[in-house]
């Protein structure tokens, strides 16, 4: 009897919370892309590139690197050890390729970025024991997912979302991996930034 009463009371207490969840209005969330460069930011960038030599050099360096990536092999996760260098290279590749697509409109950059994203989603994990590695990977996928959203297939979107949740978010609930929450170093900022950007994407 006591157990039945406890279950009943718990259910009654949760009903308002469930009802509140159902009433969340998502219509106010900005459409993709919403991270760093919003829709139509490309026009302003193209204009600045024509008048600012320094920014033009940076732009063409990104395009050149993106062109080289088109024939590069995808990244490989080492069998052991940390993967920070791999995560940072994934971030660089996905960020540059996504930028190149948004500014030039050339589909080959988006297609290669999608290939890079699916590749890292296939890693067994993103080294949550050294959560900096995971955070960099989260940021990489957040940018690619958000900036290329309209170009990605529904299957790719689902794969990326699942990887972000399982390999990125779930470890943050595990005390073995979430020490960064209490750190006073840049780990706190970098790790939280990766998690937040992935959540916003």
Residues of each region from the PLM?
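Bacterial N-terminal signal peptides
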Residues: 7-16
